[in-house]
Amino acid sequence: MNVHFIAIGGAAMHNLAIALHNKGYQVTGSDDTIFNPSKSRLETKGLLPESFGWFPEKISSSLDAIVLGMHAKADNPELLKAQELGLKIYSYPEFLYEQSKNKTRVVIGGSHGKTTITSMILHVMHYHDRDVDYMVGAQLEGFDVMVKLTEDNDFIVLEGDEYLSSPIDRRPKFHLYKPNIALLSGIAWDHINVFPTYDNYVEQFKIFVDSIVNGGSITYNAEDAEVARVVEASENTIRKLPYNTPEYTVEHGETLLETPEGPLPIEIFGKHNLNNLAGAKWICQHMGIDEDDFYEAIATFKGASKRLEKIAESKTSVAYKDFAHSPSKVSATTQAVKAQYEDKTLIACLELHTYSSLNAEFLKEYKGALDAADVAVVFYSPDAVEIKKLDAVSHEQIAHAFERNDLIIYNNSEEFKTFLFSQDFNNKALLLMSSGNYGGLDFDAVKGLLR
């Protein structure tokens, strides 16, 4: 099968391209720019385009399929040529569904927790040598690729993202997978550039639950009131299976999970991660892993890439980096670190970097998000606001939104860096939360602060 990728350099797109190459397909692609790690991974497989840009001459009737990435625009020259030739054009999720029509599809959805839960499930399967197909949004320890597709495996585990499918298909990705087994971890308004109201956002999850095949199941977080409402209101003929955060204790900085065999030391921490673990456990049991085998495997799970990643530790201090940027994730992550290191002063730093977080109307959703921190810092770049064509936000708006009088706010990366590097980190816990990099912060240098 000959497949051409328009915008092959994307995080998801290049992984799908590599997965199809590994499956024996003929794969080509184009993009106007490609950064690492995508660039080096594509190069290793011989899939890196010879030149960057869009080349309509690459599109011919010999192609069996076009996979269109979100980075491409609706007037992309290659897309227009493919439409002119009447070629079959798939969005990323559409093509994944085509590859998994004859498998049991396990789809993990939710505003937060989906990457971690998907990673937990795959870790458990890998630990017990159970081979499954998958697509996950983070690099996992022990896994070479983030997408795997085979002809033989019975199960495919898919991280179900609610963002749009492609420039010409405005449906959320997770509407296209038609799960047999689904999980819903949480609903907290996000992506306001495409879901302008809370009700509009919640509606996408209702559609997701109704897309589960007849006789399938939804495992859902019963502690999230919106999730419970959405699932319980659905008239789809599916099994509805609630889960709750398991009992656990924290002793001397170590989390102990209560199991039928007694307390089990685990590597992850925080109530939100224990809640994720409960969901992963039920999905693994649906996939044939018994409870004891799940506990044995999950004890060795260190977390998904970029999620509560410990970057430095000394005798008296510790530093974590986390991808958290939405209000619910920021709140859960900050609470988790404080609960784990109650005896340390927590310095929590958040970069407002996404379209939603830099929107003056949406800012109020961050109310109380940093309350668990002893020292709370917010950084944002005026350049990021300008690039996203948003109205400027002021220090006063941010302070008012977080409802914290002692909030420290920076919009200059050098001033933020000066603050950070002037701190005494004795008996401190440092938490850096962002989907960006604080205007070019050297994380290796940050590690040196704790030595």
Name every feature range the model reports, one short phrase each.
Residues 34-39, 57-58, 73-76, 142-143, ...:
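Short, charged/polar "capping" segments at the starts of alpha-helices
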Residues 19-23, 57-61, 70-220, 226-237, ...:
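Phosphate-binding loop of NTP-binding sites
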Residues 51-54, 90-94, 135-138, 234-252, ...:
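Beta-strand->loop->alpha-helix junctions that form or flank phosphate-binding loops
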